[in-house]
């Protein structure tokens, strides 16, 4: 009897540890680190911009090979003054709410309007967890719908606000 219990407990522990090791960890660099710390194959696409930022874009399937649930999502690492300032998960034109489900599971549930299907909800929700501000956004885009998760470390929130102000001024000038 004791051997059966031991085998069951060990089997459960292996199952738990195995499933934990397959969880997707898209934060492959720490906030404040330079972009040179990201060493991944294939080499990520780099997009410098006119506002003092540089983005590295990596398909999530390159980061989370054992977890296909978020395939189709792009992970964008935004560097300001060569310091990681924001991580964004961007999932455009997918006919699902997988980023919403991921956000609710990882950061905490939030209420949707009663009777509204998740696929039709548009809006945003914010969490403050530890040293990070996290925002989930569901919005319409030109040819459909996009889900976004933005993670900003509190130490870089002011730099992000200044960066976003520059982007906003430029967008306003384009009207």
Give the ranges of each region predicted by the language model.
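Compositionally biased P/S/T/G-rich terminal and signal peptide-adjacent segments
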Residues: 40, 46-80
């Amino acid at each position: 009897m004791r051997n059966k219990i031991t085998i069951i407990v060990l089997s459960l522990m292996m199952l738990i540890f195995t499933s934990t090791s397959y969880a997707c960890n898209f934060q492959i660099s720490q906030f404040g680190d330079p972009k040179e710390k990201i060493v991944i194959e294939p080499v990520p696409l780099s997009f410098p911009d006119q506002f003092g930022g540089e983005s590295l874009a990596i398909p999530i399937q390159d980061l989370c090979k054992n977890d296909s649930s978020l395939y189709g999502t792009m992970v964008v690492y935004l560097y300001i003054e060569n310091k990681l300032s924001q991580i964004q998960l961007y999932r455009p034109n997918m006919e699902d709410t997988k980023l919403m489900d991921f956000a609710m599971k990882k950061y905490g549930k939030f209420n949707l309007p009663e009777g509204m299907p998740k696929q039709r909800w548009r809006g945003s929700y914010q969490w403050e967890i530890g040293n990070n501000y996290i925002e989930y956004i569901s919005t319409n885009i030109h040819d459909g719908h996009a889900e976004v998760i933005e993670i900003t470390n509190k130490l870089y929130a002011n730099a992000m606000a200044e960066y976003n102000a520059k982007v906003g001024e430029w967008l306003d000038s384009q009207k």
